[in-house]
């Protein structure tokens, strides 16, 4: 089982006239490949998966697999739901489509117990043969996958190999690695990409990489090679843009930034998401000018 790691990008999903813009999506993925990104992650939080139909969700995975075919860039497909049977359907589709791994967010809104989370992930992972990465983002889902549950899943289920940690807590990442040194901990918070890698993390799933894939690739590859001074320097350099890209709920700012930078032709969201406020749009524009991406 090849464990997907390194510099990974949580892809945005571009729309045109209310529909998936397939050409723009393929173009964005190719840009990631061209900038040495190790894996693209379609239809996660940043990809507005919550407002996509299942047909659109699956089409995004297909496009990612098609564009990445024959390259060194892997596809880690989003396959999360608060209904286990839906998550299994998405995961099985991703495997059949040719995805290299699954990223599955914890069930949201219905707030399962830790035993419920265990049974959910066990059923999902056992329904496929490809690697599965847990995804913990309690600020969005309303439920925290506790370290004990993560360790239990890692011990009991062969293809669960790690977790995307988006709690923003370095302490949590250190705890997980102290308890299970072989667990792959992946940063889910761009602000602390370097600290997580320096403490034994195996990569990042980055929002900022949509805009600056070269910088994120350099940061991660330097860190994984033990070149911590270089990794820290890049992480520090990206502080202001990381902050600006989270001035409102993700993916509102990153999508606006991609539009301002000319990387997508239309700025469209699906309700209940809207364009950034005028104040935040100005902040994003000012920050992009500083980083010379406009």
Swiss-Prot record:
Its EC number is 4.3.3.7. It is an enzyme of class 4 (lyase). Its main location: cytoplasm. PROSITE patterns: DHDPS_1 (PS00665), DHDPS_2 (PS00666). One of its GO terms (cellular component) is cytosol. SUPFAM superfamilies: Aldolase. It catalyses: L-aspartate 4-semialdehyde + pyruvate = (2S,4S)-4-hydroxy-2,3,4,5-tetrahydrodipicolinate + H2O + H(+). Pfam families: DHDPS. GO terms for molecular function: 4-hydroxy-tetrahydrodipicolinate synthase activity. It is found in: Cytoplasm. The active site is at 135 (proton donor/acceptor), 164 (schiff-base intermediate with substrate). The record marks 45, 109 as: Part of a proton relay during catalysis. One of its GO terms (biological process) is lysine biosynthetic process via diaminopimelate. InterPro entries: Aldolase_TIM, DapA, DapA-like, Schiff_base-form_aldolases_AS, Schiff_base-form_aldolases_CS. Catalyzes the condensation of (S)-aspartate-beta-semialdehyde [(S)-ASA] and pyruvate to 4-hydroxy-tetrahydrodipicolinate (HTPA). This is 4-hydroxy-tetrahydrodipicolinate synthase. The gene is dapA.
